[in-house]
Amino acid sequence: MGLSEELFDRAVKVIPGGVNSPVRAYGAIGIAPRFIDRADGCHIYDVDGKEYVDYIDSWGPMILGHNFPEVKESVLKACEKGLSFGCATAIEVEMAEFICDHIPHVDMVRMVNSGTEAVMSAVRVARGFTGKNKIIKFAGCYHGHSDAMLVSAGSGVMTSGVPDSAGVPKGCTEDTMTAVYNDLDSVRALMEQADGQTAAVIVEAVGANMGVVPPKKGFLEGLRKLCDEYGALLIFDEVITGFRLAFGGAAEYFGVTPDLVTYGKIIGAGMPVGAYGGRREIMELVSPVGKVYQAGTLSGNPIAMAAGLTQLKYLYEHQEIYKDLEEKGKRLYGGMEKILAEKNLPYHINHVSSLGSLFFTEQEVVDYTSAKSSDTKAFSEYFKGMLAQGIHMAPSQFEAMFLSVAHTDEIIDQTLEAVRTYFTK
């Protein structure tokens, strides 16, 4: 038994499931999770001393690679002044100004501590601004673990929300309606059903929590038109795509402007940071100046702001990174497609820039239903086979792979050889 197994045995006695976020448990894989000791660049090192090429990137924040020198130095410098003050600081103003100066659709922004908080707050603001209650989300799109967002489609698209977690009263979700991703007709049908009471449509501009599912051509533009037609706000959940696909996120990448946007992951550079922002007339409803209440003891924490602002400034000043990540994505995911073709395997690769997924299904994956057709047992064996070769990916068929600046062509080619080796067995 290795140290990871020993730690997991200890953890399950004092932490539910042995982890502090479910996907870390490797529950779908059937082995003990790797406990990580340190990370650098595109590599992580577990407590047993094993080295892995990492394609999780801490679930997205580490776009510059682990332990990036400028970010680390900014944190150490900020720590010298203290960890938290419970008062306003200069750096949270600098962070907000930087975002508003460089993201055209964000006039005002409020910092929070997670993507979940960002979504929860943005939905509340949308309801406050419109005076309406209904929210439309999409099956397979994850928007954090607030009660109103933990909803499945039930018996069909036209069904009002049914809680997808124990402990969530039906009353918390009855105003949440679930549409089919990439299906504008399903959205229009729900808006008609809501009879003018749709406050907002919230969407992952790139589905990244059912595996990676790109929007079909015209889908996001169609959502924009439907929201305008029915008097609803369009919320882009850019917790994953924000500052990753382009500096302006999916909104810039696809050329579609939301009314509100939520951020997480990259905005904190590995620290617990989220944010939501949008048009001034909407954001001015947020307390203390407006009637929509939202607060947080550690929101705008100076250590987290130092890390996040340093990373955002670096990304803005080096926007060639985004072209580089696009090319890395073509090299990795395109290379995987070639291997599947060589081996005559009917599986599918979806990718958008640095985000990608290998789906163990013969179907083209365009929504949650087609994603669920994947053979999760086959994925589990693939994950274990790649881990044995020193490649660390998300331990779930329904999570994304993330590339970072630190993934070199050489590392990507080594990864492709590992893929080829696995499918040659």
List the predicted regions and their residue ranges.
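Conserved N-terminal phosphate-binding loop of PLP-dependent enzymes in the Aspartate aminotransferase
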Residues: 1-425
